[in-house]
């Protein structure tokens, strides 16, 4: 390897905040099912602790061996609605507490999979789990929850959409003392993927192996610095530059995933190519888009800039890694991106523009704070809009919205750490109550019939 490439890698890590955002161990709990909930919970705890006992230590060893920061070590499990559904329990909060205890025991910062897949309808387990989400998130620290309410193959389950509006509202109320932090750990999906390493939407799909390692990379600062070097050049050059940079970032993710896999004795799954920002200066997706020539993210041209970025990252990443997966799209979480926060505060970025950007990236309305008096029906209608974009365009879309109790437009909601700070954004004041009240299913689009 040439000296300048070594120096470039060091600079990417030290100055441009290149890191591995997460090493996530996916663990199947299908063999933990039991008619007795207490027995099932013991099996779950035992399996997670056994499989993930060395996860954090191995992550730290790789950090020191290669000098690559690994920000998070996490776990995803089989959707608990499936596992708990085989028991006679009528409340699943105990399962959430078991996951929380296991996460604390092995030292990971989040565990995902308190989830239900209801794109076409509910099972008994789905009903009980979704009902219990607010209490589960209020009574645990590290558990993340997700619900899939639609897919291109099946359409949108509007009964589930309506219920999720109510669940988000109740979760915000029950975690009001932390400004609705529970809602930051709850994602509503359309076309959810089974191998997502990123929280809060990670769960371990039933088609996955017993245990796998998935890696999520991150490097908005690196991409921005690369684009700075081609100022004023045509978009062809910009796309090529992003592609080459994404190749380097993904190569690092592949290396870390393979080494972790060998050290843990667990198969390597995928690298997720998503560019994930943090609130730190120099680690913003918004600033990449602005470097392309936008005065501020949210102005006209933002969606086109995001399209170029997203596509070029995928093209570069696919060449660098044998198995890519997860969400693999730019993340635009408002509270976790310094450039997004500033754009909202300046009035350049609103919910409608973020919804348009969802057509490009994976999680469009992400870490959005809305006024505390926003109704459950309005939240449900926001979910329906996002799900529709995903279902029609055959892609993953999601909503992570926080109706922080007692807040009004312009207030700031503080979460701290990687979750950052969210300015409370205005929502459309006109009602969607009668629309959401209809329930039923929005049929799958005509182009979903591929067989």
Swiss-Prot record:
Record organism: Listeria monocytogenes serotype 4a (strain HCC23)
Protein name: UPF0210 protein LMHCC_2097
Top-level lineage group: Bacteria
Subunit structure: Homodimer.
NCBIfam families the record matches: PRK05313.1
Signal peptide (from-to): none
Organism lineage string: Bacteria, Bacillati, Bacillota, Bacilli, Bacillales
Family the entry assigns: Belongs to the UPF0210 family.
Coiled-coil features, chain-numbered ranges: none
């Amino acid at each position: 390897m040439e000296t300048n490439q070594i120096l470039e890698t060091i600079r990417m890590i030290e100055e441009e905040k290149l890191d591995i955002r997460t090493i996530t161990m996916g663990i199947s709990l299908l063999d933990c099912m039991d008619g007795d909930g207490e027995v099932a919970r013991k099996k779950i705890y035992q399996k997670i602790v056994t499989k993930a006992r060395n996860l954090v230590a191995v992550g730290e060893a790789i950090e020191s061996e290669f000098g690559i920061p690994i920000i998070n070590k996490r776990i995803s499990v089989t959707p608990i609605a499936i596992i708990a559904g085989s028991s006679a329990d009528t409340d699943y909060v105990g399962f959430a507490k078991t996951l929380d205890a296991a996460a604390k025991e092995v030292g990971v910062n989040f565990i995902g999979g308190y989830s239900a897949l209801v794109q076409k309808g509910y099972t008994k387990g789905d009903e009980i789990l979704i009902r219990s989400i607010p209490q589960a998130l209020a009574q645990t620290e590290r558990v993340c929850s997700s619900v899939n309410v639609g897919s291109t193959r099946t359409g949108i389950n509007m009964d589930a959409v309506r219920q999720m509006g109510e669940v988000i509202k109740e979760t915000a109320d029950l975690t009001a003392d932390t400004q609705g932090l529970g809602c930051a750990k709850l994602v509503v999906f359309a076309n959810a993927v089974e191998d997502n390493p990123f929280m809060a939407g990670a769960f371990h799909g039933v088609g996955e192996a017993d245990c796998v390692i998935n890696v999520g990379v991150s490097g908005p600062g690196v991409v921005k610095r690369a684009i700075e070097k081609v100022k004023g050049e045509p978009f062809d050059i910009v796309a090529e530059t992003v592609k080459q940079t994404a190749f380097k970032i993904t190569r690092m993710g592949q290396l870390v995933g393979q080494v972790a896999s060998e050290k843990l004795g667990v198969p390597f799954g995928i690298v997720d190519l998503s560019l994930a920002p943090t609130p730190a200066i120099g680690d913003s997706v918004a600033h990449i888009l602005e470097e392309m020539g936008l005065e501020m993210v949210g102005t006209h041209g933002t969606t086109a800039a995001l399209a170029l970025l997203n596509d070029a990252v995928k093209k570069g990443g696919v060449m660098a890694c044998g198995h890519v997966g997860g969400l693999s799209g730019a993340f635009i979480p408002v509270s976790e991106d310094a450039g997004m926060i500033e754009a909202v505060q300046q009035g350049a970025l609103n919910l409608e523009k973020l919804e348009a950007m969802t057509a490009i990236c994976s999680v469009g309305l992400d870490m959005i704070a809305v006024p505390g008096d926003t109704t459950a029906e309005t939240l449900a209608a926001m979910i329906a809009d996002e799900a529709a974009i995903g279902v029609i365009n055959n892609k993953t879309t999601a909503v992570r919205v926080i109706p922080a109790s007692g807040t009004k437009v312009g207030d700031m909601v503080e979460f701290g750490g990687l979750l950052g700070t969210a300015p409370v954004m205005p929502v459309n004041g006109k009602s969607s109550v009668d629309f959401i009240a209809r329930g039923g299913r929005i049929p799958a689009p005509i182009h979903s019939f591929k067989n």
